């Protein structure tokens, strides 16, 4: 059995379990192209897998979390194949490197956010499959509501409740669902977008119910939104001071941090409001939200002032 046939069987198996396979399909098809689709599965060597993992999983001679992510996906595939006697051994590296999880989120300033949103409308010179207006709206919504990028890309039209200013967030990171409230400017943005979307759907006879569509009428996938974001930041000349790559997920970190700064400026009881923010973001543990308290110097300064006032009173 060659690698192409094996991957097809594996993805069909995953689908039969009603599992989400979009991300694993993307990875395995990339692995298939890297190795060669007609290579026999049992002929894949450990060095082949090692080179594939290193191709996108190493940076500056350091192993990244993406290396580990790729390894886990490939391991499940090969364990499945081994259990069915499609291979005699698992060709993955025997020793997994230690992955450093010390990545510091980047908090975008208001000026940087404005540049990102403006550049989203003109970041490509040539024809591309995404509507710039769609990408801009997706980025704005991701930041304004603190969404995970996958939550944004999975939104359906029926998830938007214009009458009650609510969004239904389904299929989250922890397989939970939640309701997210939105303020008037965000709902106005969504209403304008839905009106535009309706005209595009009618003109092109699209039938897909995803909220955000590309020019083929398909939902914009997460990896395309991430790629668009990187291109936008490059064109807008937005770079991290530590030399690391910009990340779409940092829009979510920026939302949470900016919200905490605003509460401190308003004199609100942040410790009381923190659980509310945690629920809003869909965190499973309050500790996941508390990390934002030390995310910026401005936030620490505000906290120190509040503490000093408390001590002196």
Mark where each language-model region is.
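Conserved catalytic core of the tyrosine transesterase superfamily
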Residues: 1-313
């Amino acid at each position: 059995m060659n690698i192409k046939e094996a991957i097809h069987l594996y993805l069909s198996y995953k689908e039969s379990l009603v599992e989400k396979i979009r991300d694993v399909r993307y990875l395995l098809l990339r692995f298939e192209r890297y190795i060669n689709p007609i290579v026999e599965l049992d002929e894949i060597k450990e060095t082949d897998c090692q080179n594939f993992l290193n191709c996108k999983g190493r940076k500056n001679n350091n192993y990244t979390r993406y290396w580990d992510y790729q390894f886990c996906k490939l391991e499940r595939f090969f364990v499945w194949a081994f259990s069915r006697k499609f291979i005699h051994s698992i060709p993955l590296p025997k020793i997994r490197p230690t992955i450093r999880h010390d990545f510091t989120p980047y908090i975008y300033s208001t000026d940087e956010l404005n540049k990102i949103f403006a550049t989203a409308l003109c970041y490509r010179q040539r024809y591309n499959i995404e509507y710039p207006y769609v990408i801009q709206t997706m980025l704005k919504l991701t930041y304004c509501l603190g969404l995970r990028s996958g939550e944004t890309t999975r939104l359906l039209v029926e998830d938007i409740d214009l009458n009650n200013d609510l969004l239904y967030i389904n299929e989250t990171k922890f397989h939970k669902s939640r309701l997210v409230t939105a303020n008037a400017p965000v709902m106005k943005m969504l209403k304008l977008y839905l009106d535009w979307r309706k005209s595009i759907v009618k003109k092109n006879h699209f039938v897909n119910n995803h909220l955000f569509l590309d020019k083929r009428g398909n939902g914009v996938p997460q990896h395309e939104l991430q790629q668009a974001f990187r291109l936008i930041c490059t064109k807008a000349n937005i770079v991290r001071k530590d030399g690391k790559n910009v990340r779409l997920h940092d829009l979510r970190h920026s939302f949470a941090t900016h919200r905490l700064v605003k509460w401190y400026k308003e004199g609100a009881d942040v410790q009381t409001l923190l659980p509310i923010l945690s629920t809003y973001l869909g965190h499973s543990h309050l500790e996941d939200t508390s990390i934002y308290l030390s995310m910026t110097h401005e936030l620490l300064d505000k906290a120190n002032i509040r503490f000093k006032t408390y001590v002196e009173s």
